[in-house]
Amino acid sequence: MKFTKNEARLRRKVRIRKKISGTAERPRLVVYRSNLHIYAQIVDDTTGSTLVATSTLSISRTQEGVHANKAGAELVGKEIARLAKDKDIQSVVFDRNGYLYHGRIKAVADGAREAGLEF
């Protein structure tokens, strides 16, 4: 039986999540990609709580013309890094959520690194 793209992504996601988890000292940066928006959140897996979250949806309320392209993804990365710095989070574990590390996912990671977040 052939898997769809999303089913293949979910299988990759399960394999990745077996290996990584976020702690209070080094939480997990999760990226989700939809057709219209890009979402990023920093999660502490020991307590199961979201520490910081942002998306192109929340950024587009304050800035005009932010979409789910590479430029918007880089803005999401910079914004999540800024919010993390405000909460004294210096380093994270990057969870690509089963997506290939390319394009918009890579742009989020590059934007976060550029803003000073360590992976």
From Swiss-Prot:
UniProt gene name: rplR
PANTHER family per UniProt: 39S RIBOSOMAL PROTEIN L18, MITOCHONDRIAL, LARGE RIBOSOMAL SUBUNIT PROTEIN UL18M
Family: Belongs to the universal ribosomal protein uL18 family.
Keywords linked to the UniProt accession: Ribonucleoprotein, Ribosomal protein, RNA-binding, rRNA-binding
SUPFAM superfamilies named among the record's database cross-references: Translational machinery components
One GO cellular component, as annotated: cytosolic large ribosomal subunit
Any one GO biological process: translation
Matching InterPro entries: Ribosomal_uL18_bac-type, Ribosomal_uL18_bac/euk
Gene3D superfamilies per the UniProt record, alphabetical: 3.30.420.100
Native species: Nitratidesulfovibrio vulgaris (strain ATCC 29579 / DSM 644 / CCUG 34227 / NCIMB 8303 / VKM B-1760 / Hildenborough) (Desulfovibrio vulgaris)
Protein's name in the database: Large ribosomal subunit protein uL18
Residue intervals passing through the bilayer: none
Role played: This is one of the proteins that bind and probably mediate the attachment of the 5S RNA into the large ribosomal subunit, where it forms part of the central protuberance.
Description of how the protein assembles with itself and partners: Part of the 50S ribosomal subunit; part of the 5S rRNA/L5/L18/L25 subcomplex. Contacts the 5S and 23S rRNAs.
GO terms for MF: 5S rRNA binding; structural constituent of ribosome
Upper taxonomic lineage: Bacteria, Pseudomonadati, Thermodesulfobacteriota, Desulfovibrionia, Desulfovibrionales
Pfam families noted in UniProt: Ribosomal_L18p
